[in-house]
Amino acid sequence: MKRDKKELIVQQVTEKLEKAQGIYLTDFQGLDVAKMAELRNEFRKVGVEYRVVKNTLVKKALENVAGGDRLAEGLYNTTGVAIGYDDPIVAAKVIEKFSKKNENLKFKMAAIDGSVFEASQLPQLASMLSKVENIGRVAGLVNNMVASVPMVVNAVMRDLVSVLDQVAKQKQ
């Protein structure tokens, strides 16, 4: 590969990594073409981009990313890079689910908002709520609070009427 092409790839990967909320490194050695296509489709469904780029080029691109120096430690053997732009957790869920069915996919490391996670931390990452799940939970809490406001107001009004009624009886 010529130097110009390498520089272009580094520039493109750097731009993608700088925009990313979550960066995941995987080892895909032993996955056949059909399994790789299936993995890419799973990532695509949740809005994650999966790329295979030479380790030396990814290492160069990671120089400008928070946590990139630590993440570069995971650049060995064959490396696939999963880049999550909207939700940093969904990629972990895909990797965990896919690696249970395909032992040839191995999680190496991840960086989420500058924090680096080791391979042993994949189950914890995958068990975290995704952005959509968190929004749903907050919406449910807000909905419950809004629904309870009329009941609280009615209870206060009922108690006020009761107190006023008792005060009126005492004055008589």
From Swiss-Prot:
Keyword Cytoplasm among record annotations: no
Subunit organization: Part of the ribosomal stalk of the 50S ribosomal subunit. The N-terminus interacts with L11 and the large rRNA to form the base of the stalk. The C-terminus forms an elongated spine to which L12 dimers bind in a sequential fashion forming a multimeric L10(L12)X complex.
GO BP, sorted A to Z: translation
Sorted UniProt keywords: Ribonucleoprotein, Ribosomal protein, RNA-binding, rRNA-binding
CDD domains, sorted: Ribosomal_L10 (cd05797)
UniProt key word Protease: no
InterPro entries tied to this protein: Ribosomal_uL10, Ribosomal_uL10-like_sf, Ribosomal_uL10_bac, Ribosomal_uL10_bac_type, Ribosomal_uL10_CS_bac
Gene for this chain: rplJ
Pfam families recorded: Ribosomal_L10
Function recorded in the entry: Forms part of the ribosomal stalk, playing a central role in the interaction of the ribosome with GTP-bound translation factors.
Native organism: Prosthecochloris aestuarii (strain DSM 271 / SK 413)
The organism's taxonomic lineage, starting at the top: Bacteria, Pseudomonadati, Chlorobiota, Chlorobiia, Chlorobiales
Protein name: Large ribosomal subunit protein uL10
Disulfide bonds: none
GO molecular function: large ribosomal subunit rRNA binding; structural constituent of ribosome
UniProt record similarity statement: Belongs to the universal ribosomal protein uL10 family.
GO cellular component, one term: large ribosomal subunit
NCBIfam families assigned: PRK00099.1-1
Domain of life, source organism: Bacteria
